[in-house]
Amino acid sequence: KLFVNGDKIFLDSGTTPLECGMALMARLRAGTLQDVSVVTNSLAFSDSLARVCTVTLTAGRIRPKRQDLCGIPAFESIARYHFSAAVLGADGIDGDGVLSSTDEDTAQLARTVVEHSDRVYVLADSRKLARPSFVSYGRLRRGCMITLVTDAGIPGALLSNWRRRGFEILIAESASNAGQDGGNGKSKSEKAEAETKA
């Protein structure tokens, strides 16, 4: 399980975090997760999520294409909180574990979230691995609080290399299973020792 009862969660915008949010809603409706509060910059699913838990939208400038809020007001509002868990997307992760986004605003938002979270789950499709994007916001490293959640399509050589370097990686049937109960038989955990920090 990525989330436990009482978690205060930041949920990023983007397709993969959206799927995680849907799985989170399913657990809340089923009663397997309770007393959760969510802060999000996503306009895509905040209304639906608010029907099953307490949801707070960040401040910020609307980005219609991404259906989210960003910019300095968003960074400042996020910095007021402390999250027990956070879910972020990634547009790219290079071979050394550097996490990156397509633009500075998205990267700065991610940096701010990492600085104010106890544990961070970066959700990335295996097709984005070993392929850097434009602006970095953190790095997988041994002993850090960031966990990479990806699918079984990750190349074996890359997974072995990252394990040797102490990165923490969870392998699921798909990254969209990230919010589901890890005991439901639909996903498996691959814990290769930990990492990351902005």
Protein language model annotation of sequence segments:
Residues 25-27, 39-198:
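Conserved phosphate- and dinucleotide-binding cores of soluble alpha/beta proteins
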Residues 12-15:
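Glycine-rich beta-strand-to-loop/alpha-helix junction loops that act as flexible
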Residues 36:
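Short beta-strand element of Class I
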Residues 1-10, 22, 26-33, 50-51, ...:
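HTH-adjacent hinge/linker in prokaryotic transcriptional regulators
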Residues 19:
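Conserved SAM/SAH-binding loop-helix junction
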